[in-house]
């Protein structure tokens, strides 16, 4: 049977185990054996789950007879807000065109580099370096879309030199800067239409690897979806070598665990890729809610953005967005239809038993 969405106490416990700083201010947890209550991010040794209680705020814990932890000071809301303000300041500095080092950032917000790095990742779900790279890539895409010369766009985006761009930006653009500026012209996408256990399927491959796995009911609809995803690319039928890789893909998606060793061309924003990595960590036979998935990446308030990232997935089954359900366990919001989502989850649940 498909697992039901976890209760709120279980979600709180997951955040406490992860020392999730983004949960600070949303609830506190208390330990019966010590009589102390703490923030979710407190670095103190974790108690056994059976000895832990959760409260919506510090006042409720105080009313229940617990005393505040001297280490994390959960009753000091202003201290928590000051920490969040420092992270917000660090984000703004990282978003500037001029690159900044972790040491400079730490000095600017009056924190140690180690503490800043840990708190930044816990609050945003990304490292300071990852945040800076994401904004750098965003500026590059915007500059290229406006038609700026490639070299000027590279430096305007904040890359210190061309070699830094060629090492990193291509992972985000998914193609060369020249091709990106032309809307994907001259990018070749091979494709094949084939059968799989639940109907028809289109498998597409770019020069970098498998870039789309699209289940569907009709070939015409699948081809239309391919053209929507890659409107300016050259769409070429499969050759013999690609047909062999397609058979590997079909063999993988026809099995419960969907283990695929072929290279993948995963194109998306830094946030989308973060969500997709979290999706791949969901064990086969289990489900999570959109709220849990948002909490997993350290952004519990970004539920809508997480759902949008799931919907942007182009690699069906390989990136298992079908394993995300509503908080009450109901199925909804699957790009390729709720009926197909139910089929996939039923198959995984049956073989789990």
From Swiss-Prot:
Task: Tell me the function of this protein.
Answer: Involved in the cellular defense against the biological effects of O6-methylguanine (O6-MeG) and O4-methylthymine (O4-MeT) in DNA. Repairs the methylated nucleobase in DNA by stoichiometrically transferring the methyl group to a cysteine residue in the enzyme. This is a suicide reaction: the enzyme is irreversibly inactivated. The methylated ADA protein acts as a positive regulator of its own synthesis, as well as that of other proteins. The transcription-activating function of the ADA protein resides in its N-terminus. It activates the transcription of alkA, alkB and aidB.
- DNA-binding region per Swiss-Prot/TrEMBL record: 103-124, 150-173
**Per its record, what are the GO molecular function terms?**
DNA-binding transcription factor activity; methylated-DNA-[protein]-cysteine S-methyltransferase activity; sequence-specific DNA binding; zinc ion binding
Q: What is its EC number?
A: 2.1.1.63
| Comment field (misc) | This enzyme catalyzes only one turnover and therefore is not strictly catalytic. According to one definition, an enzyme is a biocatalyst that acts repeatedly and over many reaction cycles.
Q: Which Gene3D superfamilies match?
A: DNA Methylphosphotriester Repair Domain, Homeodomain-like, Methylated DNA-protein cysteine methyltransferase domain, Winged helix-like DNA-binding domain superfamily/Winged helix DNA-binding domain
* Top EC class of this enzyme: transferase
Q: Which CDD domains match?
A: ATase
Give GO terms for biological process: DNA repair; methylation
List of catalytic residues: 38 (nucleophile), 321 (nucleophile)
Q: Give residue ranges for domain HTH araC/xylS-type.
A: 94-183
- What are the entry keywords? Activator, DNA damage, DNA repair, DNA-binding, Metal-binding, Methyltransferase, Transcription, Transcription regulation, Transferase, Zinc
Q: Where does DNA bind?
A: 34, 43, 67
Q: Which family does it belong to?
A: In the C-terminal section; belongs to the MGMT family.
> Under what name is this protein listed?
Regulatory protein ada
Site entry (Cleavage), positions? 128-129, 178-179
Q: How is the cofactor bound?
A: Binds 1 zinc ion per subunit.
Catalyses which reaction? a 6-O-methyl-2'-deoxyguanosine in DNA + L-cysteinyl-[protein] = S-methyl-L-cysteinyl-[protein] + a 2'-deoxyguanosine in DNA; a 4-O-methyl-thymidine in DNA + L-cysteinyl-[protein] = a thymidine in DNA + S-methyl-L-cysteinyl-[protein]
Binding-site residues for Zn(2+), renumbered to this chain: 38, 42, 69, 72
Q: Name one Pfam family in it.
A: Methyltransf_1N
Cofactor(s) named in the record:
Zn(2+)
Q: Which PANTHER family match?
A: BIFUNCTIONAL TRANSCRIPTIONAL ACTIVATOR_DNA REPAIR ENZYME ADA, METHYLATED-DNA--PROTEIN-CYSTEINE METHYLTRANSFERASE
